[in-house]
Regions:
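Long, charge-patterned amphipathic interaction tracts in eukaryotic proteins
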Residues: 54-112
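Charge-rich, low-complexity intrinsically disordered segments
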Residues: 108-126
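Short coil/turn segments at secondary-structure boundaries
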Residues: 42-46, 77-82, 132-133, 158-163
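N-terminal amphipathic/basic-hydrophobic helices that include classical n-h-c signal peptides
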Residues: 1-11
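Non-membrane alpha-helical secondary structure
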Residues: 21, 53, 57, 61, ...
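Glycine-rich, aromatic-bearing surface loops/beta-hairpins
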Residues: 121-168
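Generic structural signal of hydrophobic/aromatic residues within well-ordered alpha-helices
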Residues: 42-43, 61, 65, 69, ...
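N-terminal interaction modules that seed assembly of large macromolecular complexes
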Residues: 13-78
Length: 168
């Protein structure tokens, strides 16, 4: 056992951060190691002589970062070629506003397609749907699964805009 964690039972809940994300969070990772009384020299030794332990430390840190981020998520968006899914993550439920473009020639992931969408928003070629869903036992994991499927964290501008249209 190293530090605070028993690695015999460690299973990642989320996903390992990318190399770029680790580089961005370099100081936070140093602080994470320090909370476990692991010095820079000891970390170098662990990476060299116990790579499986180093991998597990990276996984634990990744999960801690994800947990913190997911607690803060209020809005998610997933844009595909013909659909727009906008999520508002409330305390006890997730609200969804979905928009579907019937015209298969329109691709919302392109500038031209999104401009068409904006100009034809109230036409019969665009369908609106809304729904609510209560979370499972693990609200953070519900959000993470949406991110894994391609949703991105946003400030909610699109959700708030379309919420006004849908409620009229």
């Amino acid at each position: 056992m190293l530090g605070l964690f028993n690695y015999n039972y460690l299973i990642m809940k989320y996903a390992r951060l990318t190399k770029e994300q680790f580089e961005e969070l370099h100081q936070e990772f140093i602080n994470f190691l320090a909370t476990q009384s692991i010095t820079a020299q000891e970390w170098s030794d662990i990476k060299l002589n116990k790579p499986e332990v180093a991998e597990q430390e990276l996984d634990v840190f990744s999960d801690l970062v994800w947990e913190g981020v997911l607690k803060q998520v209020q809005y998610l968006e997933h844009i595909s070629a013909n659909q727009l899914h906008l999520f508002h993550c409330l305390e006890n439920e997730m609200r969804l506003i979905a928009l579907k473009v019937k015209n298969q020639d329109i691709d919302l992931t392109t500038k031209e397609g999104f401009n068409w969408f904006r100009d034809n928003l109230l036409s019969d070629d665009v369908e609106f749907f809304s729904a609510k869903k209560t979370y499972t036992e693990d609200k953070a994991l519900d959000k993470f699964k949406l991110i894994q499927q391609g949703a991105v964290i946003t400030k909610g501008d699109l959700f708030l805009y379309f919420e006004k249209l849908v409620s009229k």
